[in-house]
């Protein structure tokens, strides 16, 4: 079993989990093909992590299965936006930690 971890990535964990659940249990080659055509920022990032996990395993992508794809919450960057009459409102910029585990056949 090989794994790849990408931490503190500037993408929403909630939106990333939707993509991560789709590829769990898939063949790594099919998962990469599926992620390539998914129009989502998180899909491009998760595809890189899956490719890294496959490279760490030392096997070909066709011989690997994505056993686990987990997206955890990272720290939230807090910013402020100036508003009318001297006020300010908050902006939350979430980060995520992405863990992908693959296993050879």
Swiss-Prot record:
- CDD domains for the chain: Ribosomal_L22
Instruction: For this entry, list what GO says about its biological process.
Output: translation
Instruction: Tell me which SUPFAM superfamilies the record gives.
Output: Ribosomal protein L22
What is one cellular component GO term in this UniProt entry? cytosolic large ribosomal subunit
Determine the domain of life of the protein's source.
Bacteria
Q: How does it assemble?
A: Part of the 50S ribosomal subunit.
Q: Which gene encodes it?
A: rplV
Write out the function statement from the record.
This protein binds specifically to 23S rRNA; its binding is stimulated by other ribosomal proteins, e.g. L4, L17, and L20. It is important during the early stages of 50S assembly. It makes multiple contacts with different domains of the 23S rRNA in the assembled 50S subunit and ribosome.
Q: Which InterPro entries match?
A: Ribosomal_uL22, Ribosomal_uL22_bac/chlpt-type, Ribosomal_uL22_bac/org-type, Ribosomal_uL22_sf
Quote one Gene Ontology molecular function term. rRNA binding
- Record's keyword terms, sorted: Ribonucleoprotein, Ribosomal protein, RNA-binding, rRNA-binding
Q: Please report the name of this protein according to its UniProt entry.
A: Large ribosomal subunit protein uL22
UniProt key word RNA-binding: yes
Q: Which family does it belong to?
A: Belongs to the universal ribosomal protein uL22 family.
